[in-house]
Each structure stands twice: as structure tokens, then as C-alpha cells.
UniProtKB/Swiss-Prot annotation:
The keyword Membrane does not apply. The keyword GTP-binding does not apply. S-adenosyl-L-methionine binds at Q189, Y217, N222, E238, D298. The active site is at C323, E357. It comes from Shewanella piezotolerans (strain WP3 / JCM 13877). This is tRNA/tmRNA (uracil-C(5))-methyltransferase.
Amino acid sequence: MNLAAMDPLTYDVQLEAKRVKLKQLFTDFDTPELESFSSETAHYRMRAEFRMWHEGEDLYYYMFDKELNSKVRCDQFLPASELINKMMPVLVELLKPNTILRHRLFQIDFLSTLSGEILVSLLYHKQLDAEWEEQAKILKQTLSSQFNVNLIGRARKQKLIFDKDFVVESLNVAGKQLQYHQIENSFTQPNGKVSVKMLEWAIDVTKNSTGDLLELYCGNGNFSIALAQNFERVLATELAKPSVESAQYNIKMNHVDNLQIIRMSAEDFTDAMAKKRSYRRLEGIDLDSYNCNTIFVDPPRAGLDENTVKLVQGYERIVYISCNPNTLLDNLKELSKTHNITRFVLFDQFPYTDHMESGVFLEKK
């Protein structure tokens, strides 16, 4: 992390540099005008992780600055949500005099929401005993006088929860209130307000759709739930078990009755669609009954593998969100043979870094 780059006064210049870089990267393609969605310049990250440094009686958060090649003390952290910044000094002052809770504590993770919940995970290089558990309960009770907080203690093969290991985020998306169960230690979009802009963009590009939607890599149902209003039915796949459980929770919480989640990888689903293999997890699901004209993909940094690209090319419309423009570029070399790029977008999920969250909407030629 380059802490020196985190200057709100230079934010607009840094965002424009990303816009220029992204447009240059895709010059070989016939792309429409680049849309871009900016971030807040401070307090935009809903989660943060800090290592802990012990120095005599002192105890403080730190991060490693790659530019300086050294650790940097972080009493406050500009990118983190206001709630995390409010919690940081209160928590560390309670930990400093507590020899049981601070002993062998090496990391603290925070997960917060725009709706005011915060989850704190304390990570240790020791086993957590009954004495630690008693002190953790007191800590949670003390923090609860100021915060809507839950607490987790983690050590090797241990996870102690006081009282929940998740938060519930509430987002206003295109005038509709959506709730999302976000579990500790699983993927969620880090920038809450930009995540809303991503959902609204996806709703907009698919607003006149017909038939059904297929989503690969659906996570906790973040996009599927928001997009269900635009389709007759939605079929979504996700491999990670905690994310699938969150997705099922979110379906019920948001009263979505036209969304089916399947726990399997995109690669296995591709084989199932091609009738190469049959899977027990698909028993009772008639894939042929779905009339999916649109496919939504938000793959890992590695992008889509060759077989999944071929699967995706079979759909009339493709919504592709990417956390790695280089792998999106590689995938578009094939996808552009069969589809036109009709929308092109940059979401600044990660201000003050080189990371770019981008997206395209493609329609069959």
C-alpha cells in the first residue's frame, strides 16, 4: 500500500489517469464512450485489516508501505469507513492494559456497513482459553455501549464468536432497499457506495431484457438479487460454501422468489451445460427449462477460462464486470468476434491504487 498517494486533493487527477489508461488499453476494440463512477475521497472502504505492533506497554495498528519498504503506524486510516476510524482508538485503548487480550495478538480485521454495524476479528498466535473468553465477553459488552458491534476471536483451528460472525448491510439501490448478509472472512465489495453504483449500472444495462439470466461467480448474490427484477428467472452459480449460504440468506431476506443458486464452479457448470458430465448437485434442476438470453460474469482476477469464454459466447447479451482489465482484454479478443461492446465503464472501487474495476456490456452481432 502506498500511503503517500492517499491525498484527497489529488483524487480527481488520479481518477483521470485511470480513465486515460483504461481507454488506451482498449484502443484495439470498438468501444463506446467510457462511463466512469467516482468514489468518495475518504472513508470509502467498509473493511480493513491491520497488523498489531507491541512495544513495551504500547500497542498500535500498522500497515506495510511498499514505497517506503517499512511498516507505518496507523492510529487512523483515511480509506476506512468513519465507523472503523471511530472504533480503532477505542478498541486499542481497551486492549493495551489487558494482558490476556493483547498477549500474542498479531492482527485485527474490521468489517463495517453503511447501515452502522461493525464486526471485529482478533487474530492470535496462541490458543484461546476460558480466561481469554471471559475477557472477550467483557470487551464486547464495553464496546456495545458505543457501537453496534460483534466480536470474533481467531487462532489456529479456533473461531470463537460473540455473538455473530456476520453483518447485515442495507443499500438503497435504484430507489429500492436491499439487504445483504456479509459473513466474516468471505468476499464482499469493499467500497460500499461504489458497489451501489455498480448495481445500478447493471440494472440499467439489463432493464429491457427478456427471458432469464445466468450468473457465474455470484458470491453472496450481490448482483443476482439486484438484477432479479429485470428477468423472469435467475440461475446463479458459486463455489464457496460460506458465500452460497449468505446468498440463500439474502434471497429470503429480500423476498426474491425467482432466483436459484447452485453450489458449483463456473468450470463444472460449463461442462454440465455442454452435457460433458452430469452432477448430483444439479438433480432436480432442469437446465433446459431456462431461457437465458443474458449472462452475467464477475470472475476472479484470472478472468474466464477458454471453455467458459465459449459458453459465454452462446448468449445474446453479456454483462462482464472485471477486477483485472488485462484479463478482460484477453477475454474480449474472443468475445468481440461474436459480440459488439455497447457499454464500457470504470468503477473506482480502489482509490489511490492502480487497481481498476471495469465492465462491458456486449450484444451479439
